[in-house]
Regions:
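Conserved alpha-helical positions within TPR/SEL1-like repeat arrays
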Residues: 47-58, 85-99, 124-139, 150, ...
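Short coil/turn linkers that connect adjacent helices within long alpha-helical scaffolds
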Residues: 38-40, 78-82, 117-121, 159-163, ...
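Short coil/turn linking the two alpha-helices of tandem helical-hairpin repeats
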Residues: 13, 53, 80, 95-98, ...
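Amphipathic alpha-helices of TPR/Sel1-like and other helical repeat/solenoid scaffolds
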Residues: 5-44, 48-55, 59-80, 104-114, ...
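Structural signature of alpha-solenoid helical repeat junctions
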Residues: 4, 25, 41-44, 64, ...
Length: 236
């Protein structure tokens, strides 16, 4: 059954932090599905595309990413198909592949504009959009706007009790590095220490996520020339 195939591919794409050596075959299968499958359950199909895209992004598989964007565009043309979140994700995906910074920033802003009311169902998405926009502002020399959107993304995770999910790790790590660049390393360290505690509570101190946070802490201590502390965190 097509449902079983879609489900199994989605499960692979949602396995956090796990890379597979057969990713090319996986993406070819996804491409064949886009081309050949009968799309009779549109919400499920859209969700499939939206879960596969970030996994392709991990491998910089631009051919497949472009195919997914085109497919989403085709499906979301009629206003009665898809949700505000689907449309926001399409714009976010377009921003991912956009080379011009001003255009990418506009696409992320348009993505945020799609969602009028933030709810428990879309808070994670809105938080990610703010984080992405903050990252673009940071890379393009707009520290005040970067700070505004990064802080908004983290406050949404906090507000909706989502700080323990995997999305929070790159968001808080990037924010901590940004604070260090802005000569506020103590605040960055404090944010990462809080995150370490949350990961330890919800998961363990023996997982990849915990190690990533320790690595970021070590990097910040290295940047601030605190070698003993840097060594401690790199060892963890």
């Amino acid at each position: 059954s097509c449902h079983i195939l879609l489900d199994s591919l989605q499960k692979i794409c949602l396995m956090h932090g796990i890379e597979v050596d057969y990713y090319k075959k996986l993406f070819q299968t996804a491409g064949n599905i886009i081309e050949l499958i009968e799309k009779d359950d549109i919400p499920k199909y859209l969700l499939f595309l939206e879960n596969v895209f970030p996994y392709m992004d991990n491998y910089n598989y631009q051919k497949g990413m472009k195919e997914i964007i085109q497919e989403l565009k085709n499906f979301l043309k009629p206003k009665d198909i898809g949700t505000d979140s689907d449309r926001a994700l399409l714009l976010d995906f377009q921003a991912t592949l956009e080379i011009k910074p001003e255009k990418a920033i506009k696409l992320e802003k348009d993505a945020l504009a799609q969602i009028e009311n933030i709810t428990a169902d879309n808070a994670r998405l809105v938080s990610n959009l703010h984080a992405n926009l903050g990252g673009l502002y940071r890379m393009n020399g707009h520290p005040d706007l970067a700070r505004e959107h990064m802080e908004k993304s983290i406050s949404l995770l906090d507000q909706f009790n989502l700080l323990h999910i995997n999305d929070s790790i790159p968001q808080i790590a990037n924010y901590a590095m940004f604070l260090t660049e802005q000569q506020e390393p103590e605040r960055g360290i404090s944010e990462l220490q809080k995150l370490s505690g949350i990961i330890k509570e919800y998961h363990s101190d023996d997982c990849l996520d915990y190690a990533k946070v320790q690595e970021t802490l070590g990097t910040i201590y290295l940047m601030t020339a605190n070698l003993p502390q840097a060594k401690t965190h790199f060892k963890r």
